[in-house]
Structure formats: C-alpha cells, structure tokens
Amino acid sequence: MSQYRCYMIDGRQTIVSVEILDVATDDEARHEARRLFFDRGDADGGFEVWLRDRLVERHATPLSVY
C-alpha cells in the first residue's frame, strides 16, 4: 500500500482539505479521489492526487482554471 494525498480545491484554487488515500495503485487512488470529490460539497474547484512528489491526476471543474 502507498499513501497518496488528495487535495480538495475550491473555486478560488485554495486547498480546502487533504485526504490520505491508502491504496495500492494509481488507478485506485484516482477512483477514490473522484468518489471523495463527488461526495463532498466544499471542493467545487476540483482535486489533485499526489504520490510523494509525483502528480497522479488533476481534475478541474469547468469553472476552475489551473
């Protein structure tokens, strides 16, 4: 298992929370991050998933720009 970090981001591109994802693969981390994002209401800008210093996925909602 690896510890991925999932940063939930609001519409102003501010981190509103960080979730630790204990999963085995990048695909599992992406899936869990999407589930968390759609279950939450305060992360309307998107999310980023990181494994150490490697960006695994960046998801931005249509109104947010990175």
Positions of PLM-derived features:
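Generic alpha-helical hydrophobic packing signal
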Residues: 5-7, 32, 48
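Short, mixed-charge low-complexity intrinsically disordered segments
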Residues: 39-66
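A short, charged, amphipathic alpha-helix used as a generic interaction element across diverse proteins
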Residues: 24-44
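Short acidic, gly/pro-rich beta-turn/loop elements at beta-sheet edges
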Residues: 16, 31, 59
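A short, exposed loop/beta-hairpin motif centered on an aromatic-Gly-Thr core
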Residues: 15-24
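Short aromatic-glycine-(Arg/Gly/Cys) micro-motifs in beta-strand/loop hairpins
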Residues: 1-16
